[in-house]
Amino acid sequence: MKNEKRKTGIEPKVFFPPLIIVGILCWLTVRDLDAANVVINAVFSYVTNVWGWAFEWYMVVMLFGWFWLVFGPYAKKRLGNEPPEFSTASWIFMMFASCTSAAVLFWGSIEIYYYISTPPFGLEPNSTGAKELGLAYSLFHWGPLPWATYSFLSVAFAYFFFVRKMEVIRPSSTLVPLVGEKHAKGLFGTIVDNFYLVALIFAMGTSLGLATPLVTECMQWLFGIPHTLQLDAIIITCWIILNAICVACGLQKGVRIASDVRSYLSFLMLGWVFIVSGASFIMNYFTDSVGMLLMYLPRMLFYTDPIAKGGFPQGWTVFYWAWWVIYAIQMSIFLARISRGRTVRELCFGMVMGLTASTWILWTVLGSNTLLLMDKNIINIPNLIEQYGVARAIIETWAALPLSTATMWGFFILCFIATVTLVNACSYTLAMSTCREVRDGEEPPLLVRIGWSILVGIIGIVLLALGGLKPIQTAIIAGGCPLFFVNIMVTLSFIKDAKQNWKD
């Protein structure tokens, strides 16, 4: 019995270092918010200006890797001997569900405003050219390119899961073919896992930092409760308590049902916006934007703006590539686990087509609605952001739709459920990654899950206290730097092992 407890307890070497590092950073930030903002700006400037090119080349190289998988020697290889666990329709729906987080709702509604007001390529702000390119850049940042990079890593993890029959709960487990078992299970592997966990904690904290203001702004609109930092903290605390109750009382089935409700409600809300906002304009704008994307794609791929130094690629493209990098392992593990029995080509094509369709629908519908409201002078986004913050501006893009009360209730429920499932997923992923061998069908310890959800909540509150988008962007970019190298090592390890062990 004692031995069993030891196995399912925490793994000290990957539990305490991330906890201590993140705790110290949060304490230093809260101690002096002004000084923290100075450091944040310096870190953001250094990483994006000095190393931004590396993120851009990483995405391009991974895209070529996708083509190699689809048309190369492993294209027809099957990931496991069993038939696919899910039907193709269910498989694609599960992919779509993974895209409907509150953070996605945040960016989908407001991103186009930033692209139009501070456009790339030296275009005039709010000009016709800026508007024509606005949605095209969203389709670039949330389109086939990043999903192609995820599909490569998903194939790698699916190979380790279903072909090599490895238990992978941390990235170091996949590095045995590359660095050897001694190093993968030793200090080197521990460092890799700690980099992964620290980055993942900050990524989840930033997602919570984006999601919470949407819920509190909805509460202000619906109930007249003023949006304050204290209310944000109370809401995050309520989510943590709700998550603890769900875990303690065995209500995980309820959480899964909530996740399904989130997906169906997302379809309903997007359909409503599409119909009442202007279906004809949305389809025309999308079609034109695809053409703009194809025309400007080479420039977008390698745009670093070293001469004019306008800051657009650093503030957006590098930021988003770091965002994709930081979530790559967690997301790829999930996508790999639902893809058992599929061929490499099927997984690569299914992910790129299915997930691109999901994100393109979200960004096209929400972005087009925002542009229409701006052009018709129904809402003044710059004034809303200056006076009340970004979250209020997003809420107003929904409140401006017909049947505003019903629409706002739908959006409120969607954001609330999305964040509940986010907190649950955060605590589960971190607990699984910091515990000793939790077997299939078992749950990580309750206190560990609650502890991680509290820490993620604290990070969300700290980022909200700092104010603005820059702290959130910096947290993502800083976390993406070490995972940039971890993702490359996982990729190389897969290529090396497959070459030796995945033959006809």
Swiss-Prot record:
Gene from which this protein is expressed: caiT
Pathway: Amine and polyamine metabolism; carnitine metabolism
Role played: Catalyzes the exchange of L-carnitine for gamma-butyrobetaine.
Catalytic activity line of the entry: 4-(trimethylamino)butanoate(in) + (R)-carnitine(out) = 4-(trimethylamino)butanoate(out) + (R)-carnitine(in)
PANTHER family found in the cross-reference section: HIGH-AFFINITY CHOLINE TRANSPORT PROTEIN-RELATED, L-CARNITINE_GAMMA-BUTYROBETAINE ANTIPORTER
Protein name: L-carnitine/gamma-butyrobetaine antiporter
NCBIfam families in the record: bcct, PRK03356.1
Transmembrane segment boundaries: 10-30, 51-71, 92-112, 143-163, 195-215, 231-251, 263-283, 316-336, 347-367, 398-418, 446-466, 475-495
Native source species: Escherichia coli (strain SE11)
Family affiliation: Belongs to the BCCT transporter (TC 2.A.15) family. CaiT subfamily.
Membrane topology: Multi-pass membrane protein
GO cellular component, one term: plasma membrane
UniProt GO BP: 4-(trimethylammonio)butanoate transport; carnitine metabolic process
A Pfam entry, by short name: BCCT
Compartment(s): Cell inner membrane
Record text on subunit structure and interactions: Homotrimer.
Main location: membrane
Annotated GO MF terms: (R)-carnitine:4-(trimethylammonio)butanoate antiporter activity
InterPro entries named among the record's database cross-references: BCCT_CS, BCCT_transptr, BCCT_transptr_CaiT
Keywords associated with the record: Antiport, Cell inner membrane, Cell membrane, Membrane, Transmembrane, Transmembrane helix, Transport
